[in-house]
Amino acid sequence: HPEQAARFRVSLGGGILLYGPPGTGKTMLARAVAGEIDAPFFTVSPADILSRWVGDAEKNIDKLFRAARKHRLAVIFIDEIEAMLPRRDAVESPVMQRLVPQMLAELEGIDKDRQHPLLFVGATNKPWALDEAVLRPGRFDDRVYVPLPDEAARRALLAMHLQKLPVDPAVDFQWLVDRTAGYSGADIVGLVRTVSASVFRRAIQRDDEQWIEASDFEAGFAVCLPSVLPASLEKYARFARGEEV
């Protein structure tokens, strides 16, 4: 709604930082944003940009932003953005010493460009590793914490990934939801795959139909532990409060 945005002086572009534990769907969230505003989605990894050849990384950044600005509105998404914008006092690479200022210059004022509004979305599991300059106003003005899935999200994830599997009706679904507290979305997917593969092998060995039982999930929980430690969650909380991490 560009007319309403202009009326209320709402910027069409700008910078958004998605941060939080790994495996929580930050990339999918960025894609959903692009789909919601019907904008081209440019996604690159730091490996696509960085180069050991002098000047190549800078050229790659320039090409990326030029390509995005050819559109009426575009979304650029870079995962593991801390690899592109690390704290300069923590790296000695001459490439990064040149690249970080260039990235900061590209991000400067993107929320004010009404000719070619650009939405830059960066995702990271380590927001405290970002250069302090990128966290100042005018770059990543919006910081969105993407947490571990809550009870409702875990219920939806489990229902989606178990719906076509031969799960014994006796398995207590709420028990599964409760047992996966502290699991990331990726952890839950890994758990289901591990349990399903185990029962598949059993069905092949016994040459008959098998059901995924509660004991199979118990065995899965024994080997598929939550990947995010409580100490990591506390670091995100400190970052959100603006405290030193």
Task: Specify the residue positions occupied by each region the protein language model found.
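Walker A/P-loop NTP-binding motif of AAA+ ATPase domains
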Residues: 1-179, 183, 195
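C-terminal engagement/docking regions of AAA+ P-loop ATPases
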Residues: 3-11, 16, 28-29, 121, ...
